[in-house]
């Protein structure tokens, strides 16, 4: 598996429920190789978040990243943010738990 972990900050003037609703809408997209996205809101700062996106492999991750459809989704996502996300792409080397395989 392959994916990314992104750190980002939502603008303070953004309605958090509206942000969550828009992110949930992205879940209806049909994206080859896409497994899941998880978004965490930190306890320490309610405007700071982490996104974990999981794909079958690097090729499907890269195909999505290069797609026009993903670029449209990114622009909507970016409109909620203070600045550009910090992206950390990589290979998943371990996954544990009942739903991890």
Positions of predicted regions on the chain:
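Residue-level signal for secondary-structure boundary sites
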Residues: 14-16, 59-61, 95
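Short, surface-exposed ligand-recognition loops at beta-strand->loop->(often short) alpha-helix junctions
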Residues: 9-20
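Short hydrophobic/aromatic beta-strand micro-patches
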Residues: 7-9, 52-54
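Glycine-rich beta-strand-turn "strand-cap" elements at beta-sheet edges
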Residues: 2, 8-11, 36-47, 75-101
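An amphipathic, aromatic/His-enriched active-site/gating alpha helix that lines ligand/cofactor pockets
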Residues: 25-36, 54-88
């Amino acid at each position: 598996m392959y994916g990314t972990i992104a750190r980002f900050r939502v603008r303070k003037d953004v309605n958090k429920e509206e942000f969550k609703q828009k992110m949930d809408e992205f879940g209806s997209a049909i994206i080859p190789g896409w497994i899941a996205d998880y978004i965490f809101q930190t306890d320490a700062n309610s405007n700071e978040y982490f996104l974990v996106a999981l794909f079958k492999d690097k090729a499907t991750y890269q195909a999505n990243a290069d797609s026009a459809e993903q670029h449209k989704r990114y622009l909507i996502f970016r409109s909620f943010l203070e600045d550009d996300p910090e992206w950390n792409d990589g290979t998943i080397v371990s996954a544990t738990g009942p739903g991890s395989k």
